[in-house]
């Protein structure tokens, strides 16, 4: 299997943008990636930490606490509205610029 040509930031962004409410938990993001890209099914445990690291490190991702009536584990993650144009014309291969809040 060949590794997809996308950065972790691009993979996370794809996952969030395809979700109906434009927000996902870490496990939802990882599920999207492994379902869409067979390469990550093989290497599952190792890259999950990289996803977690990128979510907390990059300003383009915003943590949203769960609502009181919504049980489950982990916070939701969404995109900062000002970062939605960080990929040129919807191409996830190249990021236009690093987003800073």
Curated annotation (Swiss-Prot):
Binds to the consensus sequence 5'-A[AT]T[AG]TTTGTTT-3' and acts as a transcriptional repressor. Also acts as a transcriptional activator. Negatively regulates transcription of transcriptional repressor Rhit/Zfp13. Promotes development of neural crest cells from neural tube progenitors. Restricts neural progenitor cells to the neural crest lineage while suppressing interneuron differentiation. Required for maintenance of pluripotent cells in the pre-implantation and peri-implantation stages of embryogenesis. The keyword Transcription applies. GO terms for molecular function: DNA binding; DNA-binding transcription factor activity; DNA-binding transcription factor activity, RNA polymerase II-specific; DNA-binding transcription repressor activity, RNA polymerase II-specific; double-stranded DNA binding; RNA polymerase II cis-regulatory region sequence-specific DNA binding; RNA polymerase II transcription regulatory region sequence-specific DNA binding; sequence-specific double-stranded DNA binding. Keywords: Activator, Developmental protein, DNA-binding, Nucleus, Repressor, Transcription, Transcription regulation. InterPro entries: FH_FOXD3 (IPR047392), Fork_head_dom (IPR001766), FOX_domain-containing (IPR050211), TF_fork_head_CS_1 (IPR018122), TF_fork_head_CS_2 (IPR030456), WH-like_DNA-bd_sf (IPR036388), WH_DNA-bd_sf (IPR036390). This is Forkhead box protein D3. PROSITE patterns: FORK_HEAD_1, FORK_HEAD_2, FORK_HEAD_3. Residues 3-97 bind DNA. GO terms for cellular component: chromatin; nucleus. Transmembrane segments: none annotated.
């Amino acid at each position: 299997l060949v590794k997809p040509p996308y950065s972790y930031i691009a993979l996370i962004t794809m996952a969030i943008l395809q979700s109906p409410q434009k927000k996902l938990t870490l496990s939802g993001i990882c599920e999207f990636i492994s379902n869409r890209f067979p390469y990550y099914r093989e290497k599952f445990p190792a890259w999950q930490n990289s996803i977690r690291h990128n979510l907390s490190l990059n300003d383009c991702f915003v943590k949203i606490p769960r609502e009181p009536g919504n049980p489950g584990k982990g916070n939701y993650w969404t995109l900062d509205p000002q970062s939605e144009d960080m990929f040129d014309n919807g191409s996830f291969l190249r990021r236009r610029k690093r987003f800073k809040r």
